[in-house]
């Protein structure tokens, strides 16, 4: 199938949601906001002046620099460096139960399938295990898993090691991120939690902005030109380690003496 079918499917899905929005969804009644534009900008400045909050976002963005490699560098690495024959053979061997002579191949789109599939299978289990864990410590554990996942890509190009690295990284993602939201709720002022949670998504802006540019530049330098892919992935592992150290120092020195809301 060509790419046009993928785009048509995406258009159909979006159009279907639009129809649901027009004919099924009804906006719940709620009090009209009394804030004018000046007050909105005043609230924005209030958040941006909170250096503890901004520092939290900046530090946590380090993990999202790693995360956005899943949509760039990991895909290039797969296409250029990984021989997925062992995975293909295993899957096709299983598919012979249902069809004759299957010819399934692991391709770039299946990286997202591994990521999403791991979350679907394990998120409830991970959440149940960590429901009473402290947010900061859990974030550190999650980022450690994410760093380890990318580290596996540095030490081997074997197909199953590649899959294992993706799975471990995803476990780190589902461990760290929910607790980050919880952590923001703890450090935000009691009457500004919703406002702070809204601006907490700046981590994505920083992570994607830096991650995309850095990933492309470093990939060309280390992988394409130098033929040293291990240095490329170790660089991102270093960013993960620095993020962990940053969170520990932030909690030890910046939040010392502060009482969470």
Roles of regions detected by a PLM:
Residues 29-58, 90:
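Juxtamembrane intracellular "pre-TM" segments in multi-pass secondary transporters
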Residues 174-189:
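Intracellular juxtamembrane helix-capping segments at the cytosolic ends
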